[in-house]
């Protein structure tokens, strides 16, 4: 069928899910993979490019917030940001390779900020009791500054302490499932006002990222914009990526097809249109011809864009199958 090649991981008897985990104990998480390997299965959607531009040299300060429900691609996007920070040269080369395909020469000039350490975590996994535990554990200078914090006998780290640590090693903190984690925090934990302390520390990180972007980038994902978790970040006028742009649906389809097939983009639109012409004509006759106002060419283009699936099946794959967690 026009030489279309399914990616190897989908050729077995049991198809894996495509849900992304930033890190897994078996080192099979998205951030555990080599950047070239992960970028190979990544399609540069408009939202992803917007997020990458938030990492550019000379960028404005402030948090970056990804807003969207299940299956929107937030975790995949965050994994790309992680690799971009830790491997900027590889990411810039990848962008350059896509510049001609997308007819966007500006991608050749997109330069990722250098010198940051990415610290990424699906925070709702609850591997850490507090955000500062995560930072002290993963940051290159974390052990020293953890000692300073413990010696201070304070209930949360001082802003000056965190700024010193970030100044020694600039940091990009990426927190997936931030709202899920925050909403589940208890009011009290081991005598500590856990939610209040988290609220205060989030505010601190947001302010540092706004006022001192040269030492801290702060990126989180939330499900919606009416939660306490989001409102705390909203004070610092974050960049919002909401997956609701004009091209979001088409981008999502292209992302899925690129994720499933190795060479879908290498097959010409003319060949696809020729192959699907009869089906597209009958689909239009059965579903749209009685409505009077449907654009036949637009409907045919929709069929070509979704090939090798029908538009209805691709929607089903996205909603019910591909976005489920692998068993």
Residue ranges and their predicted role:
Residues 158-167, 192-217, 240, 262:
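Substrate-engagement module of ASCE P-loop NTPases
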Residues 82-117, 145-156, 196-197:
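Flexible phosphate/Mg2+-sensing switch loops adjacent to catalytic phosphate-binding sites
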Residues 225-327:
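Amphipathic alpha-helical segments of the small helical/lid subdomains adjacent to P-loop NTPase cores
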Residues 165-195:
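Conserved P-loop NTPase "ATPase switch" module shared by AAA+ and STAND
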Residues 127-162:
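Short glycine-rich substrate-engagement loop in P-loop NTPases that contacts/grips substrate
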Residues 1-72, 79, 85, 237-270, ...:
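Walker A/P-loop-proximal flanking segment of P-loop NTPase domains
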Residues 81, 176-177, 213-226:
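A short beta-strand-to-loop transition that corresponds to the Sensor-1 phosphate-sensing loop
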Residues 68, 118-127:
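A short hydrophobic beta-strand->loop->alpha-helix junction that borders the nucleotide-binding pocket
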